[in-house]
UniProtKB/Swiss-Prot annotation:
Extracellular side: 52-60, 256-274
GO CC terms: basolateral plasma membrane; chloride channel complex; plasma membrane
Protein name from the UniProt record: Bestrophin-2
Record family assignment: Belongs to the anion channel-forming bestrophin (TC 1.A.46) family. Calcium-sensitive chloride channel subfamily.
Taxonomic lineage of the native organism: Eukaryota, Metazoa, Chordata, Craniata, Vertebrata
Catalytic activity: chloride(in) = chloride(out); iodide(out) = iodide(in); hydrogencarbonate(in) = hydrogencarbonate(out); L-glutamate(out) = L-glutamate(in)
Role description: Ligand-gated anion channel that allows the movement of anions across cell membranes when activated by calcium (Ca2+). Transports a large specter of anions, namely mediates the movement of chloride, L-glutamate and iodide. Calcium-binding triggers the dilation of the aperture, but calcium-dependent gating is only effective when the size of the passing anion is bigger than the closed aperture. Mediates the calcium-activated hydrogencarbonate movement and participates in colonic hydrogencarbonate secretion concomitant with mucin secretion.
Keyword Transmembrane applies: yes
Length: 512
């Protein structure tokens, strides 16, 4: 039932998609022609009534109604609602196909883990795959109308060979009111455990791999059941349907051609068939039809999933793989390129031009650089000290205005930040350098006359000062130098920016 046109668009050419417009099976014309004819018929009926049935007074009232509907019909968000809805439906549609219970991976694990050339080993492998196929049939007949019509009862499943009569008795004797598609998976596990006890499955690793692959298969069956149970919320579908139908109901009236003699705006042309309105109906209503067809791909539409084909294919291929192909290997022999240094498959005359194309090495392999740009640079001295980097960064960020120049607030706050981000002050660093440079027993140049401090060891943390009030800051003794010159500020200092931390401002006030 799937419409496949992949071969028709294998090569992009002039009018490539145009040929697809002539297809009927699975086309939008097949889905929409009834609605399109109904809309066109109603439109023509209203147009004929306006022209030949209504009186002059009634025509004036109808014209006002047409202008009103045409003005406010655009308030309905048809494109917005339809876009999200169709995206949701298409994503759900593809995920449902990915949840189809295919047995290919499971049959490969069975043929590689369940061993035995005798009849019992063959019976184990075939029965395991038959249980997997039975579980797929049970879930598909629960969600697909096409599969249900093929297997309407359990008797039909038994007659088709997916279940024996003894298994049917055990299946029907299970006291459960829920869907029992999972029962064959449990039979699969029990039979695999029995094969492990008999040594048909040689180790626990292979047994674990077999059960893990079965759980993947069973989870896909469960996902199909949940997709069938949990639909797209009904309110969403109702909103989209009402939006589309109400919009085109308003277009039936609002898109009517009025008498040009009345002088209405944008009504200078009098036609009978609304061409662009029909195109708009074709696109929007067709968009809704796409969602209507894809919302349940397990029906009998032209583009629904080929569930019966998948059942037949999986059953035949799985039985062939675990039975006739078990341990069936061709004789090992050297390949054609055994002695070749470079293995390269030949090309036909139609594809010989591909041999001339260079292999792709990466998008950067064609980039060329100048010789001076390829010289390595020394890393010495490229990184500035941390405190200087902080200062430069703040110099770029802080605004400069009245009272905030180099000698104003900015010049006072940056040294404070440097002192707060360092372990010692600048004066202490200078004194430490002087003390460190003094010889043993000599008086340091800093004049502190204290014991020399080893700068290699971290200073012990000072204990917090307890008391009702903290002592005032006492400046360190300064070495004799030139007298200080006090330079008054060029203006009043402005208020501190609100983004600066308050402790910095408080420390500045105490220092002032």
């Amino acid at each position: 039932m799937t419409v496949t046109y992949t071969a028709r668009v294998a090569k992009a050419r002039f009018g490539g998609f145009s040929k697809l417009l002539l297809l009927w099976r699975g086309s939008i014309y097949k889905l929409l022609w009834r609605e399109l004819l109904c809309f066109l018929g109603l439109f023509m009926a209203l147009s004929a009534a306006y022209r030949f049935v209504l009186t002059e007074e009634q025509k004036r009232y109808f014209e006002k109604l047409v202008l009103y509907c045409d003005r406010y019909a655009s308030l309905i968000p048809v494109s917005f609602v339809l876009g999200f809805y169709v995206t949701l439906v298409v994503h759900r549609w593809w995920n449902q196909y990915l949840s189809m219970p295919l047995t290919d991976a499971l049959m490969c694990v069975v043929v590689g883990t369940v061993h035995g050339h005798d009849e019992r080993g063959r019976l184990y492998r075939r029965t395991l795959m038959r249980y997997a196929g039975l579980s797929g049939v049970l879930i598909l007949r629960s969600v697909s109308t096409a599969v249900f019509k093929r297997f309407p009862t359990i008797d039909h499943v038994v007659e088709a060979g997916f279940m024996t009569r003894e298994e049917r008795k055990k299946f029907e004797n299970l006291n459960s009111s829920y869907n029992k598609y999972w029962v064959p998976c449990v039979w699969f596990c029990n039979l695999a455990a029995q094969a492990r006890r008999e040594g048909r499955i040689r180790d626990n690793g292979a047994f674990k791999l077999l059960l893990e692959e079965l759980n993947v298969f069973r989870s896909k069956c469960g996902m199909l059941f949940h997709y069938d149970w949990i639909s797209v919320p009904l309110v969403y579908t109702q909103v989209v349907t009402i939006a589309v139908y109400s919009y085109f109901l308003a277009c039936l009236i609002g898109r009517q051609f009025l008498d040009p003699a009345q002088g209405y705006k944008d009504h200078d042309l009098d036609l009978c068939v609304p061409i662009f309105t029909l195109l708009q109906f074709f696109f929007y209503a067709g968009w809704l039809k796409v969602a209507e067809q894809l919302i349940n791909p397990f029906g009998e539409d032209d583009d629904d999933f080929e569930t019966n084909f998948l059942i037949d294919r999986c059953f035949q291929v799985s039985m062939l793989a675990v039975d006739e192909m078990y341990d069936d290997l061709a004789m090992l022999e050297k390949d054609l390129y055994w002695d070749a240094a470079e293995a390269r498959a030949p090309y036909t005359a139609a594809t010989a031009f591909l041999m001339q194309q260079p292999s792709f090495q990466g998008s950067t392999f064609d980039i060329t650089l100048a010789k001076e740009d390829m010289q390595f640079q020394r890393q010495d001295g490229l990184e500035a000290p941390l405190n200087e980097a902080h200062g430069d960064f703040l110099q770029r960020l802080l605004p400069v205005g009245t009272g905030m120049g180099t000698g104003g607030l900015l010049g006072r706050r940056v040294p404070l930040l440097r002192r707060k981000n360092s372990h010692v002050s600048e004066e202490s660093m200078a004194a430490s350098c002087a003390c460190a440079g003094a010889p043993d027993g000599a008086v340091p140049e800093c004049g502190c006359e204290g014991p020399l401090v080893d700068l290699g060891q971290p200073e012990p943390e000072s204990e917090p000062i307890t008391g009702p009030e903290s002592p005032a800051l006492v400046p360190a003794p300064r070495a004799p130098s030139e007298p200080l010159t006090v330079v008054p500020l060029s203006g009043t200092r402005g208020p501190a920016p609100p983004w600066l931390p308050s402790p910095i401002g408080e420390e500045e006030e105490s220092l002032a």
